[in-house]
Amino acid sequence: YYSRLLAVSRDGDWTGWCSFFLTALIDQARTNQRKALDILGLYRERKDWIATATRSQYAVRALDWIFARPIFSSSDFVDNVQIPRPTANRIIRVLRQEGLLKDLRPASGRRPAILAFSQLLNITEGRDAF
């Protein structure tokens, strides 16, 4: 990066800089396209899975909410997913037991648990971060 940038000011090598920059742009676009396809594949895979695992008519609504907020507090889920509270709590329990959700911070006293959808986060990070 710096050598190409220096070559612009030192040698007037705008062609080299533009080539470098556009190559990086293409590489990043390919990476982002792969991530988008991986996320879509994960959604399709988990859509069928969650319906079976939870046996709930609200399973897809819960999955959509989790995909939109892959790190969340259990109380935020229960309060905002717009499904009955007992069902929301049961869905969280099932998803934790099945390993779809991981505890980033366990519940303690009045503090709710902080949960993460690690598969989605790992795709977006491009590594096993969670």
Predicted feature descriptions by range:
Residues I66, A88-L101, L115:
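Basic amphipathic alpha-helical segments that dock to polyanions
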Residues Q33-L63:
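Short alpha-helical segments that sit at the start of domains
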